Amino acid sequence: GCVRDMVRGLTPKDYDIATDARPETVQTLFPRTYAVGAHFGVIIVLEDGFQFEVATFRSDDAYIDGRHPSAVHFSSPEADARRRDFTINGMFYDPVAGEVIDVVGGQADIAAKLVRAIGDPGKRFAEDRLRMLRAVRFAAVLDYQIDKGTWDALVANAASINQISAERIRE
């Protein structure tokens, strides 16, 4: 949500970092780290009293359980963006160049106040059913509309919402 907030002109509440550095490289560069999902390329870095989530750019294989990919592969910013849920969450910020990297149309959808799934909405919701609830939450909290194709897929898959654990919904 950091880049989404920046594009909306808001100060981000937290900063998640995406990089081409592999998890083991991140752990070598920073003395205080712990792995929360190293197999997914996610390391927590503790620095100057702050906690940063550092994720390696990745692409995912097929989702087998409605939540987790069967395998991940470290990849590029473009591939990483295309595996994400919604265009408004698929952007990166390059602090050196001072520019937003947007290969999925997130900036246009923010300007249009639209929640749109990246790629095939039905596939996005089948990968992780919680994304349906996230779409509704983003629309409500941000006062956005849900894109018609995304909405149609949400309605078509709504019966599978009961397969989401209560613990995940509370997260």
Give the role of each language-model region.
Residues 2-171:
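Catalytic cores of the polymerase beta-like nucleotidyltransferase superfamily
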